[in-house]
Design a protein with these regions (language model features):
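N-lobe entry segment of adenylate-forming
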Residues: 1-62, 66-81, 85, 109, ...
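Conserved pre-ATP/AMP-binding loop-to-beta segment of ANL
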Residues: 47, 176-194, 200-201, 215, ...
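Conserved AMP-binding/adenylate-forming core of the ANL superfamily
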Residues: 49-104, 121-130, 183, 204-213
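Adenylate-forming
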Residues: 148-153, 264, 280-335, 346-355, ...
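Conserved AMP-binding/adenylation subdomain of ANL enzymes
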Residues: 213-230, 240-283, 297-305
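AMP-binding/adenylate-forming catalytic core of the ANL superfamily
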Residues: 277, 285, 296, 428, ...
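Conserved AMP-binding/adenylate-forming
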Residues: 315-317, 324-463, 471-473
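Conserved C-terminal "lid"/linker of ANL adenylate-forming enzymes
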Residues: 500, 504-505, 516-517, 537-587
Length: 587
């Protein structure tokens, strides 16, 4: 028989089918003893994880049942590789089925998975390798497992750290001989989560099964998770909001989830809204402020949002992970109200890795509420009669989540009444047991079960208002200045946007403290740069009443944390070390 190869057609590939939103399995709000038990229960239903490409096309459906089977095999491979209970297994946290299986595999093996960041577009090869080396030195893992495409970078970090490194495709080919999986208890450490490092060197936060599941239950109760809910996320799994809020919480609360990779969101942010529009049920989706900002900027003023999007079923549009800016959120409402988006869907929140994730959530349906606070109240100074009053909008971040307490304290630890600004402390079952191998830092922030969050805020009728990071505060002549206020003032000038500006304090040649403002400038014309510098200086003086140092720097110069937030502390250190080089401008 003769076969004509030219006329043969390849067999049609079957497109994956997304896991369903609804399930007959009775919903349990994370009422489990261990994360492994939560996985077992979720695997008995039909929901799961769904991975999409940059255009929002489904490329892999991953039911929780398949995740459990793969995690079991991964646990056996880890045990065969010599991984013992309590060992750390470092995993480069790509948003993928492979990472999910390895994360749970480490948990089932009794080890502590340690999610590590992916490279970012604003950092170079050496800075990424150095970042991995620092975190590998901190967590001291038995293995580092990573995607094959990162073999060169992650492999270099592993070799430099004396850690065995392997890509996960190669690891998946290893034998998985039968073995007994260790039993876990609620107070065993479940995983290590590196804090963002926005205001201090990154720490490995030790999170127990009890702490995790308590926080995940608080998510479900706070957001009133319903049968029609589906989660949509682009958040990175190496950040606590992505890992805990959009990977572990949907599993422990049995919610199907649709994912875009973070780098795909950065290229095509409106694909996020496409996924939400396609969901026929109700949507739960979180983003830092900058995610909403990018989408509002991308939609053209000539474009009718309803021609492409249907956001009428977006039930919870969470806000968190950075300072919530009312002006940005209003711009998002203005851009997408035509597509059915309702401002009451916004759900501001407050949290940090040291509390597993959530400390407070706004009650569902209340949206964004702000209070105008006079600048002198924020700075601790009295208002002069000859000085016009200036106000700052402070966002209400909701009420303490279930089983969490929040207190506002003076510097000496004395509790403060409603309306008084002080340090934010919290206490509850989801507060960390401590930083891994760092007792001094643990003792510095944990006192009698209470966690010093490092943030400043005030309470009002049970609601928490966050005004900024204590360590970011600029104190000049005994007066407090919030860098966010200075940065916001500069952002209002034409040509600048959120993330272009970093404000901090430096010591002037005369020994006095003075504000410094670094501004990313896109203009190549020197005369225009001089004009901008002088305009910025005048704007900052109008806000602070002081002269300041203004330096214009090239775009994409300001350092970021692994989650993409501005790192003012690192910007200051790099500037003082001469590693951030401003444009040379005439005085």
């Amino acid at each position: 028989m003769t076969i004509d190869l030219a006329t043969m057609t390849a067999p049609a590939t079957v497109a994956p089918t997304a896991t369903p939103t609804e399930d007959r399995l009775p919903r349990r709000f994370s009422d489990f003893t261990t994360l492994g038990e939560a996985l077992d229960y979720a695997a008995s239903g039909v929901r799961g994880l769904n991975f999409h490409d940059a255009r929002g096309t489904l490329v892999r459906s991953y039911p929780f049942a398949q995740l459990r089977a793969d995690a079991h095999d991964a646990a056996l491979r880890l045990i065969a590789a010599g991984v013992a209970p309590g060992d750390r297994v470092a995993l480069v946290a790509e948003t993928s089925a492979e990472f999910g299986a390895l994360f749970f595999g480490a948990v089932l093996a009794g080890a502590w998975p340690v999610p590590l960041p992916l490279p970012t577009s604003f950092g170079g090869r050496e800075s990424y390798i150095d970042q991995l080396r620092v975190q590998l030195a901190s967590c001291d893992p038995t293995l580092l497992i990573y995607p094959a495409e990162l073999a060169q970078l992650a492999g270099a970090a592993a070799e430099a750290s004396g850690v065995t490194g392997v890509d996960w495709a190669a690891f998946a080919t290893r034998p998985a001989p039968a073995a007994s999986l260790p039993a876990a208890s609620a107070d065993d450490v479940c995983y290590l989560q590196y804090s963002s490092g926005s205001t201090r060197f990154p720490h490995g936060v030790a999170v127990t099964h009890r702490a995790l599941l308590s926080n995940l239950a608080a998510h479900a109760h706070g957001m009133q998770i319903a049968e029609t809910d589906r989660c949509i996320s682009w958040l990175p799994w190496y950040h606590d909001m992505g890992l805990v809020g959009c990977f572990l919480s949907p599993l422990a609360n049995q919610v199907s989830t649709d994912y875009l990779k973070t780098e795909d969101f950065a290229r095509r942010p409106l694909s996020w809204l496409d996924l939400i529009s396609r969901n026929k049920g109700t949507s739960l989706s979180y983003s830092p402020t900058f995610g909403y900002d990018i989408c509002a900027r991308r939609i053209s003023s000539q474009t009718k949002a309803s021609d492409r999007f249907d956001l009428s079923r977006w039930r919870v549009a969470g806000n968190g992970a950075d300072m919530i800016r009312p002006d940005v959120m209003q711009a998002f409402v203005d851009a997408f109200a035509d597509a059915g988006f309702q401002a009451t869907a916004f759900l501001p929140s407050y949290g940090l890795a040291e509390a597993t994730l959530a400390v407070s959530l706004m009650p569902v349906g209340e949206g964004i509420r702000v209070e105008l606070v006079e600048e002198t109240e924020l700075s601790g100074m009295h208002h002069g009669e000859d000085r016009p009053q200036r106000y700052r909008a402070i966002v209400n971040c909701g009420k303490a989540v279930r089983d969490m307490e929040i207190q506002i304290r003076e510097e000496d630890g004395t509790p403060l009444p409603d309306g008084a600004i002080g340090k934010v402390w919290c206490r509850g079952p989801s507060v960390m047991v401590g930083y891994f191998r760092d007792q001094a830092s643990t003792d510095a922030c944990l006192v009698d079960g209470w966690l010093d969050t490092g943030d400043m805020g005030y309470m009002s009728d049970g609601y928490i208002f966050i005004v900024g990071r204590a360590k970011d505060m600029i104190i000049i002549n005994g007066r407090n200045h919030w860098p966010q206020d200075i940065e916001w003032a500069v952002e209002q000038l034409p040509g600048f946007k959120a993330g272009d500006i970093a404000a901090f304090a430096i010591t002037a040649p005369g020994g006095e403290e003075t504000p410094a403002v670094l501004v990313q400038c896109r203009s190549s014309d020197e005369a225009e740069r001089v004009r901008l510098r002088d305009e910025i200086r005048d704007r900052v003086r109008s806000v602070t009443g002081m002269n300041c140092v203004v330096e214009l720097i090239p775009p994409r110069t300001l350092p970021r944390t692994s989650s993409g937030k501005l790192s003012r502390a690192k910007a200051r250190n790099l500037y003082l070390a001469g590693e951030i080089k401003p444009y040379d401008l005439a005085a």
